[in-house]
């Protein structure tokens, strides 16, 4: 079967500058900002400034901005925490969701963005809040409505000697959307190895960790801010600098076993039923080992990437071989899955055995494999964690897959992970199935109903 090569569109895309200047900022409909809320935000920033003035290890400040709800990009901080040549949004180092009560007591999902800023940015924000607090207290009776704010004339604003009209309204907008400022800390005791992502600061990761008595080598650093730590190191970091931790997950994964395969070895007595491959597209597979004795072995280019000193058992070949068999000749084993796409060649990288393994080590291998095989655009990954993903943030594994896909223009087909038969309730997917850019798949029957072992997410 002869196929045309993949076409790549190349060119330069240009966008004409918008000749229209942005208009005067406005408050949302029916919004009311009370002086008490402005005062509380100011006091919170004052406490944060005091904390970071004493704790100088990160050469700046981490400030978590808790919003009242999920906010659009245009409704994030507009002026507070900005500083010369930097918009407020430029300093965002992390984002997460929390479930908390709203003003009516109903539990809703809210945004939290963590900023890394110089202390001068906090000082500036405090001064702006102080000015706006005074104006609202003295000239608007302690609260200002959307109608009053939007009637302000930028030319005749009476307080231009203190603050411009536009900046006055920008501060009010920030106050309307922001619930509070805080310094968020991770506080838990761990007993296993962890993959930790810390917030990016202006200090090299190894140098920063050494300030807290943690010394690591380069092979425990994934992308500059994602690191592998042992239990005592994790607990030490939590105790001394819990504010640094953006994401963390147990560094232990295992196969996301496809129940349809039942871990049976692929039959090898079907010789000569497949033509030799020609120029069919290649799919990359990152899994356990591949059995080169199977009938479709001509279609698979196998690379064994586990250490030669690790003994392999027959079980170490079952899952990986079965996955590649589906890609090469899937409908032969299950005619109901015939999609008319024909056969695909596979470049198979055996990175694991059937037992549990280090996610961190596999992630390092995945980046190396993808970067060295740029001709492959579609990758299959059936390795995942048996533990559920965090409710409020993406996993370090999922984030790394997203980075790899963005950097190398590839897509991963990732197993949604399966729950054990002993699990009766619904169970969320496991990392890295929370990757945003990946195509995550799970099992359904021919009526479209989820299988008993299917997990849910995110």
Regions found by a protein language model. Give the residues of each.
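Subtilisin-like peptidase catalytic core
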Residues: 23-42, 46-50, 55, 72, ...
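A generic structural motif
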Residues: 103-124, 196-199, 220-233
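Protease zymogen maturation seam
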Residues: 163-194, 206-282
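Acidic-leg catalytic submotif of subtilisin-like serine proteases
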Residues: 268-309
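Extracellular S/T/G-rich loop segment that most often corresponds to the catalytic His/Ser-adjacent loop
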Residues: 281, 289, 295, 430-458
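Active-site neighborhood of phospho(di)ester-bond hydrolases with catalytic His/Asp-centered motifs
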Residues: 287, 380-382, 412-419, 441-442
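Loop/turn-to-beta-strand initiation segments
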Residues: 343-345, 409-413
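Catalytic-core regions built around general acid/base machinery
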Residues: 396-409, 431
């Amino acid at each position: 079967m002869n196929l045309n090569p993949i076409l790549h569109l190349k060119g330069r895309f240009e966008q004409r500058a918008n000749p229209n200047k942005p208009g005067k900022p406005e408050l949302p409909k029916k919004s009311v900002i009370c002086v008490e809320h402005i005062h509380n935000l100011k006091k919170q920033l004052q406490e944060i400034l005091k904390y970071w003035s004493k704790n100088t290890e990160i050469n700046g400040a981490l400030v978590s901005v808790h919003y009242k709800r999920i906010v659009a990009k245009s409704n994030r901080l507009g002026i507070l925490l900005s500083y010369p040549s930097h918009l407020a949004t430029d300093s965002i180092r992390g984002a997460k969701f929390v479930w908390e009560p709203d003003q009516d007591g109903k539990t809703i999902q809210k945004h939290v963005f963590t900023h890394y800023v110089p202390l001068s940015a906090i000082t500036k924000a405090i001064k702006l809040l102080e000015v706006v607090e005074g104006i609202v207290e003295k000239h608007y009776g302690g609260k200002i409505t959307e109608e009053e704010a939007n009637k302000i004339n930028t030319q005749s604003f009476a307080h231009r000697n203190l603050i411009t009209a536009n900046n006055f309204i920008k501060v009010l907008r920030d106050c309307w959307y922001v619930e509070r400022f805080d310094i968020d800390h991770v506080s838990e005791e761990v007993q296993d190895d962890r993959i930790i992502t810390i917030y990016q600061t202006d200090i090299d990761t190894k140098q920063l960790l050494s300030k807290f008595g943690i010394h690591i080598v380069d092979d425990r650093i994934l992308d500059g801010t994602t690191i592998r730590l042992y239990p005592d190191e994790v607990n030490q970091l939590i105790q001394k600098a819990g504010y640094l931790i953006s994401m963390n997950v147990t560094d232990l994964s295992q196969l996301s076993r496809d129940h349809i395969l039942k871990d049976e070895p692929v039959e090898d007595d079907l010789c000569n039923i497949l033509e030799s491959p020609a120029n069919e597209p290649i799919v990359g597979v990152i899994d356990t080992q591949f059995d080169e004795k199977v009938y479709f072995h001509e279609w698979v280019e196998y690379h064994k990437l586990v250490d030669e000193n690790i003994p392999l058992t027959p079980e170490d070949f079952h899952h990986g071989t079965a996955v590649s068999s589906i890609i090469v000749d899937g409908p032969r084993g299950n005619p109901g899955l015939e999609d008319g796409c024909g056969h695909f060649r596979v470049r198979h990288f055996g990175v694991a055995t059937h037992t549990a393994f280090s996610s961190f080590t596999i992630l390092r291998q995945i980046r190396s494999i993808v970067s060295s095989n740029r001709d492959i655009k579609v990758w299959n990954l059936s390795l995942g964690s048996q533990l559920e993903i965090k409710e409020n943030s993406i996993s370090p594994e999922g984030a790394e897959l997203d980075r790899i896909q963005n950097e190398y223009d590839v897509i991963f087909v990732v197993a949604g992970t399966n729950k054990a038969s002993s699990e009766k309730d619904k169970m969320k997917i496991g990392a890295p199935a929370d990757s945003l850019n990946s195509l995550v798949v799970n099992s359904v029957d021919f009526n479209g109903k989820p299988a008993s072992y299917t997990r849910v997410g995110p």
